[in-house]
């Protein structure tokens, strides 16, 4: 397999992982405090990850002080050889308002249950979520480095890509 084909295949497997998972754990560090939070997300073809959160939340306060973050996406498994997932490093920032509609539409497409929750909320909690969904802040996590772990290919199997000159390359 050529290096170009290998890169293309690796990016496709990363995209598949992003598509097939729903939560990402974002880790922040600012001053002497670190924090992590799991959030629902959507992603785009550039491997950017978008999530919604309150400006007052601890992980967002960390991002506002230090935009460099790390993250993981994985399934909870009990067998070492089933461990698969992504480790990521990059920057996170608040998304400009003009992109809000497209990102929220992506949420509606990825999360089937969100239609009923937002359009026909039943409980007080659902009504609260529906109201907040339209005003909550949107953030982008722009990875600069991604590691794909897949122990089904052999214990400790990992492949990495990184951004160089705005292009994904295999990290050697």
Map each language-model feature to its residues.
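Extreme N-terminal tail/first-helix region
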Residues: 1-23
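Short, surface-exposed beta-strand-loop junctions and turns on beta-sheet-rich folds
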Residues: 57-59, 78, 154-156
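Alpha-helix boundary recognition
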Residues: 18-19, 64-65, 108
